[in-house]
């Protein structure tokens, strides 16, 4: 599938600032499920950006503005061809050992209830078991828009029985740890047929299975990633995989608008 993506993030500030710095994980990389034909980021400071690949294989740009305006617009766009691999990515080009993803964060720390759910689907076949985990999470945690916030943990969302894609991914990561399976948070895009505009950035998870390598799972949609998905970055949880992380020296409030448009090209 040939997809054209345009992802614009607009920050509005109440008052001018004296310094702003952003770390961007907005550039997707080639992998067995996608080929990135072109990709560009437009933002103040991109001409002097520091660009590097971090230990998890993410393409990162570090930009800054010495005298930032009251509005900051960051636009990422490009063309990607995707293939349905059943979610299987295998061994990717990254320095990190998969076992580091057995380490919990505050957002992916498990609970007695999550551990019990994970134990209830313990099976001898790891792939079958992780599929069962995905189904159990989707069944027990309903997708409800605006039912959580950026700081909601896996344990809190599971106890509430509601969440969004971020919460489903965090719970999945915590549940996999109960079976000693490394799992991580993934950000990217999901193309929805008959929808010209995506609601927002999407998130899912990946589990590392000894015979397959990294395999994607999207509990929010009860499926493994298909050719409708474009993988952008990964991390231990939502904050560590966020597409934009920034700081600004400013006394006023911040207002954020995100617009994502994904179109299929014939």
Predicted regions and their residues:
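Linear, non-domain "peripheral" regions
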Residues: 1-116
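Hydrophobic/aromatic-rich core segments of domains that either
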Residues: 135, 167-252
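A broad, low-specificity signal for short, low-complexity segments enriched in glycine/proline
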Residues: 1-4, 32-41, 144-146, 164-169, ...
């Amino acid at each position: 599938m040939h997809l054209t993506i345009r992802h614009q993030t607009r920050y509005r500030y109440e008052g001018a600032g004296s310094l702003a710095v952003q770390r961007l994980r907005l550039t997707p990389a080639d992998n067995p499920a996608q080929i990135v034909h072109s990709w560009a980021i437009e933002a103040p400071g991109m001409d002097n950006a520091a660009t590097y690949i971090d230990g998890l294989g993410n393409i990162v740009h570090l930009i800054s503005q010495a005298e930032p305006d009251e509005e900051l617009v960051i636009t990422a766009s490009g063309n990607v061809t995707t293939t349905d691999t059943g979610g299987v990515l295998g061994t990717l080009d990254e320095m990190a050992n998969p076992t580091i993803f057995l380490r919990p964060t505050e957002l992916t720390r498990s609970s007695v209830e999550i551990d019990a759910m994970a134990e209830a689907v313990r099976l001898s076949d790891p792939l079958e078991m992780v599929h069962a985990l995905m189904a159990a999470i989707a069944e027990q945690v309903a997708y409800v828009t605006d039912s959580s916030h950026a700081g909601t943990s896996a344990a809190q969302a599971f106890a509430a029985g509601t969440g969004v894609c971020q919460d489903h991914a965090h719970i999945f990561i915590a549940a996999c740890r109960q079976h000693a399976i490394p799992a991580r948070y993934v950000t990217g895009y999901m193309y929805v047929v008959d929808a010209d505009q995506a609601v927002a950035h999407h998130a899912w998870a990946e589990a590392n299975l000894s015979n397959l390598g990294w395999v994607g799972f999207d509990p929010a949609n009860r499926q493994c990633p298909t050719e409708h998905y474009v993988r952008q970055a990964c991390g231990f949880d939502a904050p560590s995989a966020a597409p934009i992380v920034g700081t600004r020296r400013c006394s006023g409030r911040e207002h954020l608008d995100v617009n994502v448009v994904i179109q299929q090209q014939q």
